[in-house]
Amino acid sequence: MRTTVGAAVNAASHFRQSQVYTAPKRILRNIRRGQFTRLVASLHPRCHQGPNKTALNRYPEIFAAAAAAAPNAQRILSFGCSTGEECVTLANYFPHAQIVGTDINPLNLLKARKHRSERVRFVYASDRFLCGFGGFDAVFCMAVLRTWKRKRVAEFYPFDRFAERAQFLESLVRPGGLLVIHAATYRFGDTVHRWTYETIPVAAHQRTKVYLPDGVTETTPESCIFRKLKPVALSAG
């Protein structure tokens, strides 16, 4: 009898140390820590970065410069809005604008919707749906188009992937509107679409290191605010 009890105790101890027992507990622990949102996002084919850290007024110099450059903006997109704090911030800087926040992470959107108001709304990041808005006066993409890898950057996040998403975002900007891309792995200025925009200067702000298209060479980022040039009408003569 004593041997049977001892064997049962040992079996229970081994079970508690097994993956079958520990894996669900580890997943639940990560959910409580907020790390589950990173897992959900990383499994999405259009995910560009894992961490979803955000805060109110996270980039005050950039927001102020953009507001000065587009004081009459009526519709603004926060691409990769995370849990919504950026949208609240933009609503303060652009008092006359409707703010649309979008994210691919449904858990982020659940948290973001507590910030909904008459001027702030949140939607799932469907390209087709965003195209249906008819353009934006400003598109903000802050710390989204990036990888946090420090080695083999081109392998984990090639420049072509960045350029493809940058092309989509710039297609949403109305002529005369702003495209704001900050804390990205690469520079918008190295894409072919750069020549249809002019640079808006920004007061001194924190600049993160970026890479050239080879994904190896580190370089200094340029200004992160760009104004889409209006088409030039050619005279018939």
Each language-model region and where it sits:
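Class I SAM-dependent methyltransferase Rossmann-like catalytic core
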Residues: 31-72
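Conserved SAM-binding loop of SAM-dependent methyltransferases across substrates and taxa
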Residues: 83-96
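Conserved SAM-binding motif I beta-strand of class I
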Residues: 98-103
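Conserved SAM-binding strand-loop segment of SAM-dependent methyltransferases
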Residues: 117-127
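A short acidic, Gly/Pro-enriched loop at the edge of an enzyme's catalytic core
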Residues: 128-143
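A short glycine-rich, Lys/Arg-flanked "PGG" loop and its adjoining helix->strand segment in the class I
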Residues: 155-178
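Conserved Class I S-adenosyl-L-methionine
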Residues: 189-219
